[in-house]
Amino acid sequence: MSTTNDNTTMQRLMITDMRPLSMESIITSLTKEIITHKFIYLINNECIVRKLDERQATFTFLVNYEMKLLHKVGSTIYKKYTEYNTKYGTFPMPIFINHDGFLECIGIKPTKHTPIIYKYDLNP
């Protein structure tokens, strides 16, 4: 009798531990996968070559981020993700500094679910 009870308890524990990831966890992990040193380098290169102002650079950052996201997760998940981001304002936004007219992206502003991330802390 006690073996059956222990077995049932163990099954219940396994079921609760296997719950799906929350949207916040998915957003955080996707952001870390997409925004890397290479991604920031490409944004900074665009800023220098095209001499973008901060508004244009932010737009370029978001377009590139969303294209990588769409390519990575597909259109169905992308739609859910962007609806959530629009509702809760969790899009990653860049931090720029100005070097005599040339912008450099040095990191990502904190959002509801992620802390401030500097480019030196990103994956290579």
UniProtKB/Swiss-Prot annotation:
Family: Belongs to the pneumovirus non-structural protein 2 family.
Role played: Plays a major role in antagonizing the type I IFN-mediated antiviral response. Acts cooperatively with NS1 to repress activation and nuclear translocation of host IFN-regulatory factor IRF3. Interacts with the host cytoplasmic sensor of viral nucleic acids RIGI and prevents the interaction with its downstream partner MAVS. Together with NS2, participates in the proteasomal degradation of host STAT2, IRF3, IRF7, TBK1 and RIGI through a NS-degradasome involving CUL2 and Elongin-C. The degradasome requires an intact mitochondrial MAVS. Induces host SOCS1 expression.
Record text on subunit structure and interactions: Monomer (instable). Homomultimer. Heteromultimer with NS1. Interacts with host RIGI (via N-terminus); this interaction prevents host signaling pathway involved in interferon production. Interacts with host MAP1B/microtubule-associated protein 1B.
Gene Ontology biological process terms from the UniProt entry: symbiont-mediated perturbation of host apoptosis; symbiont-mediated suppression of host cytoplasmic pattern recognition receptor signaling pathway via inhibition of IRF3 activity; symbiont-mediated suppression of host cytoplasmic pattern recognition receptor signaling pathway via inhibition of IRF7 activity; symbiont-mediated suppression of host cytoplasmic pattern recognition receptor signaling pathway via inhibition of RIG-I activity; symbiont-mediated suppression of host cytoplasmic pattern recognition receptor signaling pathway via inhibition of TBK1 activity; symbiont-mediated suppression of host JAK-STAT cascade via inhibition of STAT2 activity; symbiont-mediated suppression of host toll-like receptor signaling pathway; symbiont-mediated suppression of host type I interferon-mediated signaling pathway
Annotated protein name in UniProt: Non-structural protein 2
Notes concerning its domains: The DNLP motif has IFN suppressive functions like binding to host MAP1B.
Alphabetical keyword list: Host mitochondrion, Host-virus interaction, Inhibition of host innate immune response by virus, Inhibition of host interferon signaling pathway by virus, Inhibition of host IRF3 by virus, Inhibition of host IRF7 by virus, Inhibition of host RIG-I by virus, Inhibition of host RLR pathway by virus, Inhibition of host STAT2 by virus, Inhibition of host TBK1 by virus, Inhibition of host TLR pathway by virus, Interferon antiviral system evasion, Modulation of host cell apoptosis by virus, Viral immunoevasion
Span of the annotated motif DLNP: 121-124
Domain of life: Viruses
Organism of this sequence: Human respiratory syncytial virus B (strain 18537)
Annotated localization: Host mitochondrion
Main location (coarse class): host cell
Keyword Glycosyltransferase: no
